[in-house]
Amino acid sequence: MAPPGQLLPLARSLLPLSAPPFVSGRRRRLPTLVLGRALPPPTWLPHGRLSPAHPLPFAPPRRLSRPPPPATSLPGASPGGGAEAQAVLAEFVTSERVKVAAMLGLALALCNADRVVMSVAIVPLSQAYGWTPSFAGVVQSSFLWGYLVSPIIGGALVDYYGGKRVMAYGVALWSLATFLSPWAAARSLWLFLSTRVLLGMAEGVALPSMNNMVLRWFPRTERSSAVGIAMAGFQLGNTIGLLLSPIIMSRAGIFGPFVIFGLFGFLWVLVWISAISGTPGENAQISAHELDYITRGQKLVKTQSGGERLRKVPPFSKLLSKWPTWALISANAMHSWGYFVILSWMPVYFKTIYHVNLREAAWFSALPWVMMAVLGYVAGVVSDRLIQNGTSITLTRKIMQTIGFVGPGVALLGLNAAKSPVIASAWLTIAVGLKSFGHSGFLVNLQEIAPQYAGVLHGMSNTAGTFAAILGTVGAGFFVDRMGSFRGFLILTSLLYFSSTLFWDIFATGERVDFDGTG
C-alpha cells in the first residue's frame, strides 16, 4: 500500500477532469477531452462550479414540447396500460376508419335481414297464395339463382371501381328489390320471383365490397378486427330478420318487413354517400396522424385515385393454378355449406327432433347468431394481437381457421347426441359461435395473398360457396327423406369440417402470391 503522503497525488493523477478545490488547495490544470477533442482548461468559480462559458463534456438533454402520439392500435392490442390504453381506445372508437367498419356492418346487417325475411314470410305467403311445400322451396332458392354468379362479376367491379361505389349501387338495388316485393307478388308470381333473383344478384357484391373497403382503410394489423366488426353486423342481420319480422307482420301485414327493410336500405345509401370516402386520402375529416398510421400499415401500390385498381382481365388460369387459391375456395365452400344448412334447417330440426313449437324453434335457432356476432369480433381482436406480438400471418390464419372448422365439427357431434332442446341449443350456439373464427381466417386471407385481385378471388370462392350451400341444403333434405333423421347428415358435415381443416392447414399462406408473374 502507498504511504499516506502519496495517496493524494495518486488520486489527483487518476481524475479525468481537473480536481475541484475540495480535493486540493492547488488546482491542477489537465486538458479535458470531449469526444477526442482537447479543450482549454476550465475556469473554476468559487465553491467548485464550472464557468458557464465553458462547454459541458456532454450534450444537455432536450425537452420535447409535446410527447409523440402513441401508436394507434385496436382495443386490447396496446402494450401500455391504464391511461394510455384508454387514450388508444378513445382514438380508435372515434377514428374515421371505425366509422367505415360500422357502416359496413350496417350494410351487411341489411343484407342478411332482407335475405332471411323470406324464411319468416314463407309460411303466411304459402297459405295466402296456395303454394305447395315444394314450390315454397323453389321460392326460397330463387335468391341463390341470382347470387350464384354475381360475386365474380361484383368482385371484378369492386377491383376496378372501388368498394364505396359498388357497395352503394348494390345496397340501393337490393333495397329496391325488397321494397318492390309486395307490388310484384300482387301482380305476377314470376315477377315476384324476379325480385328475389334481383336481390341475390345485388347482394353478391356485398362481401367483395366489404373486403375492398377494409383493404383500403385498415392497416394489416387491424384488418381482422375490422372484418370482425363488419361480420358482426352480418350475423346480427339474421337475428334482426328472424325476430323482428313476425312483430312487424303482426302490425303491418305480411309484406310489412319488406317495405321497412327496403326503406332502411335507401337511408343507409344516403348516409354512405355523404359520410364515407372511398380511401383515407379522400376523406376531409381524417386526422394527419390517422392517415399516416393507415398509410404506414399498408404496403399497396397507389394510383391517382388512392388505391389499387385492376386494369386488365383477371388472370383466372393463373389464379386457379395456385394451391392457396384452392385453399380459399375449399374454405369458403365448407363455410357456406355449414352456414346455410344451419340457417335453413335448424328451426325444422328443433321442431321435428324435439317437438317444440315454431316460435320456440325460432328462438333456439336465433340465439346462436348473436354468439357468432360477439365471437367474430373477439376472434378479430385476438388475431390482430397475435400478429402484433410477432406471430406470422400464415400461422395466425391457420390457427383462426382451424378453430373455425374443428370447433363446429366437434359441436355438431355433440348436437347429434343431445337429449333435450336446451342442450342442443347450447351445442348449436358453440358451433355457430366458433364458426365465426373463420372470418379471421379465410375471409381476411383474401386480402393478403392477392390484394389487387381480392374482389375477384372473393367472387370465385363465394360462387363455390353458393354451389356448396345449394348442395348442402338439398342434401339435408335428402338425408331426412331417405333416413328419417338429420343425424347422418350432421356426422357427414362434421367429417367435411375436419377434412377441410387439413386441406387449409397444408396449402394456405398469409404471404402475397405472385399471380402476375410467369413463375
UniProtKB/Swiss-Prot annotation:
TM helices/strands, residue ranges: 100-120, 138-158, 166-186, 188-208, 229-249, 253-273, 326-346, 362-382, 403-423, 424-444, 460-480, 488-508
Composition bias type Pro residues, residue spans: 56-72
Pfam family of the protein (one): MFS_1
Main localization category: plastid
Gene Ontology MF term list: phosphate transmembrane transporter activity
Source superkingdom: Eukaryota
Localization (cell): Plastid, Chloroplast membrane
CDD domains with a match to the protein in the record: MFS_SLC17A9_like (cd17380)
Membrane topology: Multi-pass membrane protein
GO process terms (BP): monoatomic ion transport
Alphabetized UniProt keyword annotations: Chloroplast, Ion transport, Membrane, Plastid, Transit peptide, Transmembrane, Transmembrane helix, Transport
Location of the transit peptide in the chain: 1-76
GO CC term, one of those recorded: plastid
Family indicated by similarity: Belongs to the major facilitator superfamily. Sodium/anion cotransporter (TC 2.A.1.14) family.
Biological role stated in the UniProt entry: Probable anion transporter.
Protein name in UniProt: Probable anion transporter 3, chloroplastic
Organism from which the protein derives: Oryza sativa subsp. japonica
